[in-house]
């Protein structure tokens, strides 16, 4: 029978020919907008982690809940768990020490210093893709082992804190003395969408180390935390892995000594698992059937657990005491000759050919084996620079212990930001340079002092544009990922920020504000910079006919140059800041995508981003003083002119350069050029979501709302790093 006859018969019976069989009628099914337009602007990234996804509600105060925690009891429960072997996932040598160290390490090790994203700070290991990464095989079991403890203590301890604390307790239980522990990591309730894990479509796709310097990626292969333990692209060559190791650990802000300490310390305890070929391993947690209840990688080999476990496919035990801290890693590394071999799963590894059988079997005390190592472990012996450090640690175990303690603390706390965010009884007293330390406050300005300072700033001769621009330059370095940057510390006045091209306004404005600070001696320079923005906005609002008081919270301090790591702060220099119409490079993403990226780092919503761009344009805050996007005949007035003129159909826009970065807006009737713009301006008229927001502020009744919304978003940015107010 023909298709026509089939359709006729269906219609004659009253059935719809297009909704039969297995059609998915569930919400979100079907072809999505991004399927049609894969380059669609990701405005949705600004809607992540809203209160709508948070079951605890916006009034939940984690710091307050943590203060109720019986911290000692929690650590006691974690210690007991380490040796409470469960039949569904038996512990190697009766201890989960190695498993929990790996869980903490792999949670923290996704951090990338280049953009501040990744890391352990939000408990992302619970969600895809990290919960199902090839490098995280079996960590689902570690998290499940922790569940009874999380259930017991509830919201007094976040998953994010619990993961790292479990790693610390595991180290301590092995006899190691850790540097300390700072709690304060707050859970989120959905995967991070903003992290660029790479554009590869297949797991374990190899990346050249040089490529890592051009993108914010933390691993040399998709789905790994760091490097391939078998060497680059399974080469089996220890020396060739050195560049990859330096690139990945360097992307976390680690130097060679920290890198050696972390690799050796992490491989002093525990083992890898490769009892048989990976073909025995089932689907990862995200792909596993519903009855698996979030557990993945079920193995069909033998019992699938214990001695039959398959994780990385490597079968390596590094030391004679895999549950107790020692210096055996370095002793074995240099004492024996190593021969390349393969694990039972076929993975490349090395065996100490001239060593006796001194390594205990994890499940049969009557058995021993030879020491084994990963390809990348031997890099620490054969790379000349790594070898020098390794030999020093071999001969000075205490130096190794100290280096690992500090490097582990840095690894697990790197994305937490300043020490002011740390809570708990084990926070170290020592300030560390990578924490961006700040001095104690010298000033406590009164309300009268603030009024007098505002008057002095207003009389200084600075323009509205200059006052607003310098405040933005100071505060907008903040990164929501690792909580670095911001106005507190006045590092705008220090190297390297004072020399950035985007901060050209600082050379004109800072001398005026510095002189004012010295003359009045009532507030820090950091406070005065932010207060200058307050004065500028209040003047601009008044010029627009709106009287408003911009909230200001004093208490910022001024950092010293010796408290500022120039190399690490250089990573905060923007390649683009659409709020100031700045673009340094054209080979990285689109201008509008980088605007979204900047807004997301500033934790802004789409409406907040929109109102800030519109307001800053009419206040003339472009980094170079250009008129791009200044769609107003009255600059310095906090008006809605940017939106009204952008959406005005009297103007037709055309590119003026081959890169389609600059545009002219001409009068459709006369052909006269009225305005110029960048992509960061025109996106608010071209993108359907942003246009909808722009229309709100372009309406005739939006003026007062616009000013209030602008002030609220502005104050949010100015206070992003005020962790002292928590």
Swiss-Prot record:
GO CC, any one term: cytosol
Organism superkingdom: Bacteria
Crosslinked positions (Tryptophyl-tyrosyl-methioninium (Tyr-Met) (with W-105)): 226-252
Active-site feature positions: 106
Enzyme nomenclature, EC number: 1.11.1.21
Binding site for heme b: 267
Classification via PROSITE patterns: PEROXIDASE_1 (PS00435), PEROXIDASE_2 (PS00436), PEROXIDASE_4 (PS50873)
Keywords: Heme, Hydrogen peroxide, Iron, Metal-binding, Oxidoreductase, Peroxidase
One BP annotation, GO: cellular response to hydrogen peroxide
Keyword rRNA processing: no
A family per Pfam: peroxidase
Cofactor note: Binds 1 heme b (iron(II)-protoporphyrin IX) group per dimer.
Residue segments, region Disordered: 1-33
Tagged with keyword Ribosomal protein: no
Co-factor(s): heme b
InterPro entries assigned: Catalase_peroxidase, Haem_peroxidase, Haem_peroxidase_sf, Peroxidases_AS, Peroxidases_heam-ligand_BS
Cross-link annotation Tryptophyl-tyrosyl-methioninium (Trp-Tyr) (with M-252), location: 105-226
Catalytic activity: H2O2 + AH2 = A + 2 H2O; 2 H2O2 = O2 + 2 H2O
Example of a GO MF term: heme binding
Stated role: Bifunctional enzyme with both catalase and broad-spectrum peroxidase activity.
Family listed: Belongs to the peroxidase family. Peroxidase/catalase subfamily.
Name of the featured protein: Catalase-peroxidase
